[in-house]
Amino acid sequence: MLLYGDYHTHTTYSRHNHGKGSVLENASVAADKGLKQIAITDHGFNHEFFGIRRRQIPQLQEDILNAKEITGVDILLGVEANIISLDGEVDVKEEDYEFLDILLMGYHKCVHTSSMKDKALLCWANNFGNPFRPSKERLNRNTTAFLKALDKYPIDVITHLNYGFPTDTIAVAKMAKQKGVYVELNGKRICFTEEEIEIMTAEGVKFIVNSDAHRPERVGEVNNGMNLIYKYNIPLSQVVNIDKLPKFHKKRGN
């Protein structure tokens, strides 16, 4: 059982020293660990502190080409987009698709939202609310925002679902399956109940195991997800980057 690729890794393009290593360092570790492919998926453009800047994309593209040539690892350019409105907007524009090989989407606390209402009900309500016992209204708002995002954008992976942003897991997972989106088993945190894992598996939801590495040495470290696969007997046919390379939505020219 081999991990073919790690599709959630951060570099120094996640600003303010949030990501610790370069593209080349991430790729070198991936090569040493036998990975065939990785994605560089720094924080989205609207993150208040850690987001990559669009003006940095040409240099990132150059870094990726250089690292590919040196290491032989295939490297995808992506972003971990942020949900920024109750209406399911995320911080990517249509013109961004021209450089994106992969699009991840998740919730993060400190983002520039579309309006003050979105800041209050999306960010503040979740940042300061009880993460374990959300009100029905908050749960419904969060779930609806995710469902709308999945319907609007060519998202490939939902990252760390429910972390700081509780949702109706099964509703989101069913929509993800319908849209060909993978649910991440995150290398740092997995916020699912045993029942939710069993239902998602029975429903045929596709999973992807990623490290969420913020340091080069963490690239390819997916024991958290692998242990869950073993524990709940998730069929490997439902894990898209074990013993195979996953397919992602076509974005260029959309």
Task: Label every model-predicted segment.
Residues 24-39, 62-72:
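Alpha-helical scaffold segments that flank or form the walls of functional sites
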Residues 1-12, 23-24, 92-95, 115, ...:
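Charged catalytic cores and adjacent phosphate/nucleic-acid-binding surfaces used
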Residues 43-44, 80, 188, 213:
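Short, ordered loop/turn segments at secondary-structure junctions
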Residues 17-24, 88:
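Glycine-rich anion/phosphate-binding loops
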Residues 50-178, 230, 238, 250-254:
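Extended substrate/RNA-proximal surfaces in nucleic-acid metabolism proteins
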Residues 6, 38-48:
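Short, conserved active-site loops that position catalytic residues or coordinate cofactors/metal ions
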Residues 8, 30, 42, 75, ...:
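Divalent metal-coordination and catalytic microenvironments
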Residues 15-20, 49-54, 219-221:
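Short, solvent-exposed loop/turn segments at secondary-structure boundaries
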